[in-house]
Curated annotation (Swiss-Prot):
The gene coding this protein: astB
UniProt-listed Gene3D superfamilies: Succinylarginine dihydrolase (3.75.10.20)
GO molecular function: N-succinylarginine dihydrolase activity
EC number of this enzyme: 3.5.3.23
Protein name in UniProt: N-succinylarginine dihydrolase
Active site, UniProt feature: E174, H252, C372 (nucleophile)
Catalysed reactions, semicolon-separated: N(2)-succinyl-L-arginine + 2 H2O + 2 H(+) = N(2)-succinyl-L-ornithine + 2 NH4(+) + CO2
Assembly notes: Homodimer.
Residues reported in the UniProt entry to bind substrate: 19-28, 110, 137-138, 216, 254, 366
Record-level GO BP terms: arginine catabolic process to glutamate; arginine catabolic process to succinate
Source organism of this protein record: Legionella pneumophila subsp. pneumophila (strain Philadelphia 1 / ATCC 33152 / DSM 7513)
Amino acid sequence: MNVYELNMDGLVGQTHHYAGLSSGNIASTNNALSISNPQAAARQGLEKMRQLYNMGLKQGLLPPHQRPNLNLLYQLGFKGTPSEQINKAYKTAPELLSACYSASSMWTANAATVSASVDTEDNKVHFTAANLISNLHRHQEADFSKKLLEFIFSNSDYFNHHPLLPKSMGTSDEGAANHNRLCQSHAHSGINLFVYGKKVLGNHQFEQSPIKYPARQTKEASEAIARNHLLNPERVIFACQNPLAIDQGVFHNDVISVANEHVFLVHEEAFYNQAYVLDQLREKADFPLVIIQISKEQISVSEAVDTYLFNSQLITLPDQKNMILIAPAECQANLKVKTCIDGLVADPQNPINSVYYLDLKQSMRNGGGPACLRLRVPLNDYELKAMHQGILIDNDLLDILDKWVLKYYRTELKIPDLADPQLLYECLDALDELTQILKLGSIYPFQS
């Protein structure tokens, strides 16, 4: 049976802006208060989807969340009509208004953790939407992400959805950005590598903690997901992220490593006690595992964070054994990083034989590269057929969405623009039309 890795990219919302809301995300902090271009951001994302679809990959999308989040404004004490809520928040707590307007749901690698049916005891695809409690602007996404995934993957014969993990610091979960799956091919059972930044409960004296920036994913959360998803404990590894890397801006593991099938591309300073982690992978692998370890002399952690090399997508084209690296254009612009990539492509010892550079500047300036923008969902033929078909991409749908973006999206957004109530109504009109395009029904709060 055919098994595909469906890439579900986040469609960038109309309120994409730069507010520096994410501690430990250096690009987000450095570009705070810059002027954004939501239309360009959305079109860059659509072009990414188009390129991967035209390469022969299965491609879908997750729609933007409703913004501003009026319910969150209400919870934070801003009452009245929507216009009054927005005005009060802008005057007294503009940073909270910015959080309520955040378009960060576009980074769907944080939407959930997904387990392939070939890995689970009940042979179903398992989903746990991430609670994202580390940041207010991300935490507000959790419930709607769960609702979306339950709608899109609604057939209980094939799909199993779990509740959010408890909303506590002890079970802080950031989704698939801290999960990798290594396997002979997507059709074979795999090794599930869960990466955490801290252990909260019990004895953790042998592990260090970051000092400058917070660790977001807990070991307790990763362990709970592995249990809930009915994964074989013998095929699961829990690895601690290098705290020194976190302090250099590696806020998720997908900023410092990327896996695809039997290939693991990783920086040598990605993990705490990295030699042991890689030995575990080799020991558990019943397939020819290829580990490509990039040294700090080749590329420093800081350079990896600046260019998001490891936040590239590593993909296998249909009916081919070779792989393509889908990298941000920032990698091409950095001579040292480009030289490293050229070396990877030229090396016959690994299956990566080409690279494709993407312009994702709008997302990159907020700390999100190609891998941040997609949630990987392994599906066989039956599972693919059983999911909601309206969000699956083809060129016709991409053309419709491009026209929709041109119709509704502004070409410039500054922080003071968030005080304009008209932006709210522009967003609602756009989302109302989008649900019809994607056949999602009345899924947004304002539609009920």
